[in-house]
Design a protein with these regions (language model features):
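Extended beta-strand/beta-hairpin segments
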Residues: 1-43, 53-134
Length: 134
């Protein structure tokens, strides 16, 4: 079982702690002293799919040198203002097979990334892949 908690610290800031014991500061207001809960959802999505892609490319022995996943998202105008559209942009460095990268991204989206699976219930997720040599 995974557990998490958020403890109010001040203003609209919280200290979030999960089963791993690591803590993060969360800012639920517009003060922007830390990431908001909805920003953390997007960061979680980026990290989830990135870890899948890295794992798959390593298993295929693809010589990638860097990977960054960015998310651009739109939210519904009315509460609870869920994400309705998310564009994931994968930026891959190195002399990698484009097919291998595309397969890894597809597998992450369709099979492995649990965050993506949850968000796809309310949001259309689209993909873009950018390649560059380092």
């Amino acid at each position: 079982m995974v557990e998490a908690r958020a403890r109010w610290t001040d203003q609209e800031r919280f200290l979030g702690i999960a089963t791993s014991g690591h803590a993060i500061v969360i800012d639920a207001a517009t003060e922007k002293t830390a990431n908001s809960p909805m920003e953390l959802v997007l960061i979680g999505l980026c990290a989830c799919t990135a870890s899948d892609v890295v794992s798959i490319l390593r298993k295929k022995r693809e010589p990638f040198t860097s990977l960054e996943v960015r998310a651009q998202a739109e939210r519904a105008p009315n509460p609870p203002s869920v994400y309705t559209e998310i564009k994931l942009i994968y930026r891959v460095g190195g002399k990698v097979s484009r097919k291998a990268v595309e397969d890894a991204v597809r597998l992450s989206k369709e099979k492995y990334c649990s965050v993506s699976a949850m968000l796809q219930k309310t949001a259309k997720i689209t993909i873009a892949i950018e390649y560059f040599d380092e």
